[in-house]
Amino acid sequence: MKEINVAVTGGAGQIAYSLLPRLVSGETFGVDTKVNLRLIEIPQVVDKLEGTIMELIDCGFEQTGSLLATADIKEGVKDAHWVLLVGSIPRGIVVDGKKIEERSDLLKINGGIFTDQGEAIGKLAQEDAKILVVGNPANTNALIGRTKSENPAQSWFAMTALDANRAKAQLAEKAGAEISSVTNMTVWGNHSPTMYPDPYNAQIDGVSAVEGINDLDWVENEYLPLVQQRGKPVIDARGASSAASAANAAIDTVKAVDNKTEEGDWFSAAVPSDGSYGIPEDLIFGFPLTSNGQGKIDIVQGIELNDFAQAKIKITTDELLSEKEAVKDLLD
């Protein structure tokens, strides 16, 4: 069997609990690949990972390799081929006696975490390592981590697949179609309520989703906020943020990056901008992407963006620029 080293932060969290068995079962990296898994947590809860490791052993997957629990980011990411940065400080938590409510505070406190993680990954992970940021605010966390890694050979992504999957599900339901018939979904911009889950270039059975649904008022006034704000009703209903669906989206992203994209389709993730579509360079921005299955990821070019789309993309671009400004002292 081939072997791959995979590091996961936030290993004792709810997302990881749904994610980890699927990483070592053969589903994500293939049945011919043994997965050496490194689970990383803060010192206060790292002991809980021993129970998770016992459960992974008890699953009995042939593809499960070595299992390590650590509170040391350097030990965790050493020689990693994939690093999934799931852990982050959520809004509402109390740090040093202060409740973290403002997005600017959230950006800065997570910025410190992703500074350390980026430095360790840049120095110790595989030279061609792939890094997926799941922990929010994901785009700017990825910007900080990538900047601090100082290793341009490594590939950084922020996850927008959860938004893309939510968008596909809503479009399919409205059209009375199978979700598998919804293709070419792009979530432009930030993983936040300013995101633009593009219904004009998404297709249902090969036809523009907007044309297929034929209800422009629903598309622009109901569909968009439904997808953009989906996280809140999930929290309200279950008393916690999305976990299983977020884990599923992380797996979808890893598979989309590692495998060749189907001809004519694309997938959605946030990557460093190369200036495409007028997005400022190096901003971690949600784009339509293709993979050649050999590590080369390209931004799809030539997609038509109408005035409505361009206005929405400007809003999310401006938000990301303001986030970048808020953490500029961490980007030096």
Labelled PLM ranges:
Residues 17:
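Residues forming the Rossmann-fold NAD(P)(H) cofactor-binding site
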